A protein has these predicted regions:
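Short, charged/polar N-terminal "headpieces" of proteins
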Residues: 1-26
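Aromatic-residue detector
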Residues: 2, 13, 44, 54, ...
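Broad hydrophobic/π-residue packing in well-ordered secondary structure
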Residues: 18, 27-29, 33-35, 88
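Glutamate identity and glutamate-enriched acidic tracts
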Residues: 20-24, 44, 77, 96-97
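Intrinsically disordered, low-complexity N-terminal regions enriched in serine/proline/glycine
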Residues: 22, 61, 71, 90-91
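Acidic, aromatic-enriched beta-alpha/helix-loop junctions
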Residues: 31-74
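Surface-exposed molecular-recognition determinants
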Residues: 66-67, 71-89
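C-terminal charged interaction modules
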Residues: 85-101
């Protein structure tokens, strides 16, 4: 798994290039929740979904054979940008890593 760098900022965008595709993840925080959008090769796949701890970001109908992103929270807390890279992390995992746990 590859740990991606989240900034301690409420609104941000980050890019990840695997062997085949370029992903961009946009994170937006409101007073009540954190939302995300995912672009693959500059095409929006997922738009303004609520970010939930310890879940995959790309739903299975959009997932390809090369992996997925996981938003991980040590204490299963709701996403909070002040805890990014402290107790909440974003990872990219290949399908093999996801299958083997």
């Amino acid at each position: 798994m590859i740990k991606l760098n989240l900034d301690i900022q409420p609104n941000q965008s980050l890019k990840y290039q695997n062997d085949q595709e370029l992903y961009e993840i946009v994170i937006r925080t409101t007073s009540n929740a954190t939302f995300y959008s995912v672009f693959r090769n500059q095409v929006e796949m997922i738009s303004n979904q609520i970010l939930i701890a310890n879940t995959l970001l790309i739903q299975s109908k959009y997932q390809q054979t090369n992996g997925n992103f996981i938003f991980y929270s040590i204490s299963d807390e709701l996403p909070n940008y002040t805890k990014f890279n402290v107790s909440q992390f974003l990872y990219y995992a290949t399908n093999e890593e996801l299958i083997n746990g």
